[in-house]
Amino acid sequence: MIIKPRVRGFICVTTHPVGCEANVKEQIDYVTSHGPIANGPKKVLVIGASTGYGLAARISAAFGSGADTLGVFFERAGSETKPGTAGWYNSAAFEKFATEKGLYARSINGDAFSDKVKQVTIDTIKQDLGKVDLVVYSLAAPRRTHPKTGETISSTLKPVGKAVTFRGLDTDKEVIREVSLEPATQEEIDGTVAVMGGEDWQMWIDALADAGVLADGAKTTAFTYLGEQITHDIYWNGSIGEAKKDLDKKVLSIRDKLAAHGGDARVSVLKAVVTQASSAIPMMPLYLSLLFKVMKEKGTHEGCIEQVYGLLKDSLYGATPHVDEEGRLRADYKELDPQVQNQVVAMWDKVTNENLYEMTDFAGYKTEFLRLFGFEIAGVDYDADVNPDVKIPGIIDTTV
């Protein structure tokens, strides 16, 4: 079939398998052209491995450090008549290229929050890898079925303690509008912490450690975003921020557990990028459109692969890591450059419907958004007939 982008709200409901493969190849080429990661990991588990930062971590470990990788994700395959999810095509492409390079690459499809998927992962590590020396935690999910209670909990994107009104960008209608959000209830805050906080990360590390599949000296990191003042009301000081603060708490006990065997656990702070998750946050499209304009003009603009490759090379496995007072690894320092933030703040209230394309890089934002789904990739013929039924050989599918 010939596949064109169809966008509804903050989701593109079509995906392009050839475009997704080309996007993965671009990221691999970036890593291989920037040289190996010295003393990098060799056997890596990535939880949330199919898109965005998790995919970038898998690519960086495999092609920057020659690592065997096991990826966990929750995606949907395509059929002859309907495209699958972008994450499915990304993972199929990654495995193809990794296998061509002689690397082990296998994937588990299922709910990473479940005990079942944790057990299948442990069994696969024991059978195929023995032990892993890096665990990357990069889940972004709107809800979680708690493995102990069976309750399905939802996360909420709301301020805490007060209602907030802010400028946002309606990406469908391409207009600036005021968005008002009521404060989260305590139940909504607790739910967001349960879905997006550190409990599941801790459960993963506990399960892996108890099963004896963590190598001595193993490291783990969970990805987070902190942002600057302009996004704080909705982000760091909001319900999501409560979940992020929970990560900061949970990492301490995880670190103690791994340190006993010469290992380490860190929260890694990454810059704002266009992802399916960030495009759902009301103020982020406007913030990102301004940020892209400023950072591109300064020559400091980065996407997922530049961020994560740099994180592994400079901080996770580097001699002089970028660490903050809380012990987090920081890869977002170029975004937080005061010059960058001051320019974004100065332009924030000046953007109108009329000057949107001149004042911001909304065009770049839209391109990045479509690239998530395999569109707008250079060199891809989007008028060609493609088969959306792409197989991932050897996938362990716990959903069937």
Curated annotation (Swiss-Prot):
EC number(s) stated in the UniProt entry for this protein: 1.3.1.9
GO MF, any single term: NAD binding
Binding, substrate: Y225
Keywords from the named record: Fatty acid biosynthesis, Fatty acid metabolism, Lipid biosynthesis, Lipid metabolism, NAD, Oxidoreductase
Residues annotated for NAD(+) binding in this entry: 48-53, 74-75, 111-112, 139-140, 244, 273-275
Catalytic activity reported: a 2,3-saturated acyl-[ACP] + NAD(+) = a (2E)-enoyl-[ACP] + NADH + H(+)
InterPro entries cross-referenced by the UniProt entry: Eno_Rdtase_FAD-bd_dom, Enoyl-CoA_Rdtase_cat_dom, FabV-like_NADH_b, Trans-2-enoyl-CoA_reductase
Catalytic-site annotation from UniProt: Y235 (proton donor)
Pathway recorded for this protein: Lipid metabolism; fatty acid biosynthesis
Database matches in Gene3D superfamilies: NAD(P)-binding Rossmann-like Domain
GO biological process terms held by the UniProt record: fatty acid biosynthetic process
Site feature Plays an important role in discriminating NADH against NADPH, where: E75
Source taxon at top rank: Bacteria
Pfam families, A to Z: Eno-Rase_FAD_bd, Eno-Rase_NADH_b, Enoyl_reductase
Presence of the UniProt keyword Lipid metabolism in the record: yes
Similarity-based family: Belongs to the TER reductase family.
Primary role: Involved in the final reduction of the elongation cycle of fatty acid synthesis (FAS II). Catalyzes the reduction of a carbon-carbon double bond in an enoyl moiety that is covalently linked to an acyl carrier protein (ACP).
Quaternary structure (record): Monomer.
Name by which UniProt lists this protein: Enoyl-[acyl-carrier-protein] reductase [NADH]
Organism field: Burkholderia cenocepacia (strain ATCC BAA-245 / DSM 16553 / LMG 16656 / NCTC 13227 / J2315 / CF5610)
Gene symbol of the encoding locus: fabV
